[in-house]
């Protein structure tokens, strides 16, 4: 924990998500002000006063609970400026502090009746139903006030624990219990709604049930065994996390910070507000109405109806549309609940936590760069100057080209030759990472040495395309710059494209030529039947080296598929299937000329090879020369 200039940083080893106890929910929202006053409970559905445009006290934007809406200024305006820091205004009760506390300070709503948490009730699987070993349909009947559940059968012979009773059935049993000739001394006890559910969950002894289930599993088979395993798995999770089953029924609900569900004034004087405020308002209205009905001892049927409506309001707040009718706002649009904010591609986790925008990164369309080496990529100058700006500024100042950062930035905006020269020096040996979404395996991100190119597209070597599953029909790739020296070293050693030849999944080469490369290689080395094979010794078609052939081809004296004789003293794999030459000539100087179908070999008297001329095509010479040249440079 470090504290400097009122900025507090927390360093975490891990984040654990688990079910919260009622006390934990209260602790999130409840605070004791420096004057000893306890605040945190939201009791009013109002948001802001439409005349003063200030938050209403004890409402959803209350400054006493969540902090001031303006930095260092209380609600009534008595205290302004930072010198009053930490003071609680005697008039309005608002603590004088920064307004950004409204991004993390929470409140809570104390519920007049317990409500079931819709995630645990209607989730798949339903944890409440599994724990109680009651079908989900029956649990819903209890929670939404359609059926009573027997909590204690008493002396009644026909009743069993956890048995469901309709309204009419319970009235009949009541008549039986309170009849004059009744023999029942220990009266049965029934419940309805989330209160009954809470009672059932409180009665569970998880350790004892776990032991009984383990014994039962050994003697059971098939579907029954699978059901028991499912139940024991849930129970073991509750035991391992020290969570109590009754926490799945809420006594209080947290109110998230107001700056995470803002209310914004539009140009016409109207207000745009987060859907959560409407959902919270429904909960508070129904909760206050229920508390009032209980206070005036309203008839049970009215109270029960209000409890059901409160349950539905909390369901809509947590997960709108999970059960019953979806709550809609203007234009019949479904209101966005807490679950909608968290889940899915646009949710908090995938959009904001896992998919954060990062500094020193960019993206652009990829095009083929056939002249690049495999470990290189073409980076547009416009992109490079932006990504490597801090390095360029540092070098400009170090080389005394400019005196300060401001001057360096002005010079960079001009993008003159001096800046480009410095940029070239900076990117020399500084690898960058290229990523193509979706990154399905580790080769989806690879390191390359950047080469400055014109235009706005990233140039990519065609051989690395299979690893990225990329093609050049408009695909985009992201660029990331490793900043630390360790990151650069790791990128160069482990992630460089030329070090990732094999697929990590199969172990087979993933860098394989395809399409244009295969077609080009075939065309280059193909033999055209309509070209005549020249006589050996013809000055126009006999060359002393591969280089001479290349020069003649570049001068357009030769076509690509023309037959030629070329001197090449290396090993030759030709199509001659003969074991001995067609003809052997003894020459005047004592040397020997062997005439094969596609080559002429001349040997000295000591049987050493003096020269070898090979009959081939210009295209094959180009192919061989390119490969030999590339291999000799590495």
Curated annotation (Swiss-Prot):
Query: Metal-binding: is it a keyword of this entry?
Result: yes
Q: Name one GO cellular component term.
A: DNA-directed RNA polymerase complex
Name the Gene3D superfamilies on file: 1.10.40.90, 2.40.40.20, RNA polymerase II, clamp domain, RNA polymerase Rpb1, domain 3
Task: Give the catalysed reaction(s), semicolon-separated.
Answer: RNA(n) + a ribonucleoside 5'-triphosphate = RNA(n+1) + diphosphate
Annotated binding of Mg(2+), by residue: 471, 473, 475
One GO BP annotation of this record: DNA-templated transcription
Q: Where does Zn(2+) bind?
A: 74, 76, 89, 92
Keywords for this protein: DNA-directed RNA polymerase, Magnesium, Metal-binding, Nucleotidyltransferase, Transcription, Transferase, Zinc
- A GO term for molecular function: DNA binding
Q: Could you tell me what the cofactor note in this record states? A: Binds 1 Mg(2+) ion per subunit.
Which cofactor is essential here? Mg(2+); Zn(2+)
The UniProt family comment states:
Belongs to the RNA polymerase beta' chain family. RpoC1 subfamily.
Supply the PANTHER family for this chain: DNA-DIRECTED RNA POLYMERASE, DNA-DIRECTED RNA POLYMERASE SUBUNIT BETA
Q: What HAMAP family does the database record attribute to this sequence?
A: RNApol_bact_RpoC1
Q: Indicate the quaternary assembly.
A: In cyanobacteria the RNAP catalytic core is composed of 2 alpha, 1 beta, 1 beta', 1 gamma and 1 omega subunit. When a sigma factor is associated with the core the holoenzyme is formed, which can initiate transcription.
Name of this chain's protein: DNA-directed RNA polymerase subunit gamma
Q: Organism classification, top ranks?
A: Bacteria, Bacillati, Cyanobacteriota, Cyanophyceae, Synechococcales
Q: Which gene encodes it?
A: rpoC1
């Amino acid at each position: 924990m470090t504290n400097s200039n009122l900025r507090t940083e927390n360093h975490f080893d891990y984040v654990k998500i688990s079910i919260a106890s009622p006390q934990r929910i209260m602790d999130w929202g409840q605070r004791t002000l420096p004057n000893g006053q306890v605040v945190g409970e939201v009791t009013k559905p109002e948001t802001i006063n439409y005349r003063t445009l200030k938050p209403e006290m004890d409402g959803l934007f209350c400054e006493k609970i969540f902090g001031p809406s303006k930095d260092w200024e209380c609600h009534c305006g008595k205290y302004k400026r930072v010198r009053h820091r930490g003071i609680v205004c005697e008039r309005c009760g608002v603590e004088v502090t920064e307004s950004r506390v409204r991004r993390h300070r929470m409140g809570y709503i104390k519920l007049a009746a317990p409500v079931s948490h819709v995630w645990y009730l209607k989730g798949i699987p339903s944890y409440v139903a599994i724990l109680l070993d009651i079908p989900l349909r029956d649990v819903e009947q209890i929670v939404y006030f359609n059926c009573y559940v027997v909590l204690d059968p008493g002396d009644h012979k026909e009743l069993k624990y956890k048995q469901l009773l309709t309204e009419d059935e319970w009235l009949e049993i009541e008549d039986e219990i309170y009849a004059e000739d009744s023999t029942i001394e220990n009266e049965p006890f029934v419940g309805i709604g989330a209160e009954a559910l809470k009672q059932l969950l409180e009665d569970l002894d998880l350790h004892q049930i776990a032991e009984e289930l383990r014994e039962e599993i050994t003697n059971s088979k098939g579907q029954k065994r699978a059901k028991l395993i499912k139940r024991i798995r849930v129970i073991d999770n509750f035991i391992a996390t020290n969570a109590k089953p009754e926490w799945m029924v809420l006594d209080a609900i947290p109110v998230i910070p107001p700056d995470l569900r803002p209310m914004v004034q539009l140009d016409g004087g109207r207000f745009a507000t987060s859907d959560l405020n409407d959902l919270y308002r429904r909960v508070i209205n129904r909760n206050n109405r229920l508390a009032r009905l209980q206070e005036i001892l309203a008839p049970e049927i009215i109270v029960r109806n209000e409890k059901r409506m409160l349950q539905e309001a909390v369901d809509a707040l947590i997960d709108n549309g999970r059960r019953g009718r979806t709550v809609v706002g203007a234009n019949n649009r479904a209101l966005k609940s807490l679950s909608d904010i968290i889940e899915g591609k646009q949710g908090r986790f995938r959009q904001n936590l896992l998919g954060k925008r990062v500094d020193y990164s960019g993206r652009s369309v990829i095009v083929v760069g056939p002249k690049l080496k495999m470990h290189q990529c073409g980076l547009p100058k416009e992109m490079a100057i932006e990504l490597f700006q801090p390095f360029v500024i540092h070098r400009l100042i170090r080389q005394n080209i400019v005196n300060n950062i401001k001057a360096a930035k002005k010079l960079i905006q001009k993008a003159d030759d001096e800046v480009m020269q410095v940029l070239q020096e900076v990117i020399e040996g500084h690898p960058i990472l290229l990523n193509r979404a979706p990154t399905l395996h580790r080769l989806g991100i690879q390191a390359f040495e950047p080469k400055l190119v014109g235009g706005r597209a990233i140039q990519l070597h065609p051989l690395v395309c299979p690893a990225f599953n990329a093609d050049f029909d408009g695909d985009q790739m992201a660029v990331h710059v490793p900043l630390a020296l360790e990151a650069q070293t790791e990128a160069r050693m482990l992630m460089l494209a030329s070090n990732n030849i094999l697929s990590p999944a199969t172990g087979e080469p993933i860098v394989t030529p395809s399409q244009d490369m295969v077609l080009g290689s075939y065309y280059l080395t193909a033999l055209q039947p309509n070209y005549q094979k020249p006589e050996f010794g013809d000055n126009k078609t006999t060359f002393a080296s591969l280089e001479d052939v290349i020069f003649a081809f570049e001068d357009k004296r030769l076509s690509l598929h023309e037959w030629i004789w070329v001197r090449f003293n290396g090993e030759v794999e030709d199509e001659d299937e003969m074991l001995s030459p067609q003809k052997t000539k003894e020459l005047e100087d004592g040397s020997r000329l062997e005439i094969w179908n596609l080559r002429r070999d001349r040997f000295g008297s000591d049987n050493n090879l003096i020269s070898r001329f090979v009959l081939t095509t210009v295209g094959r010479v180009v192919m061989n020369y390119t490969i030999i040249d590339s291999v000799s440079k590495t």
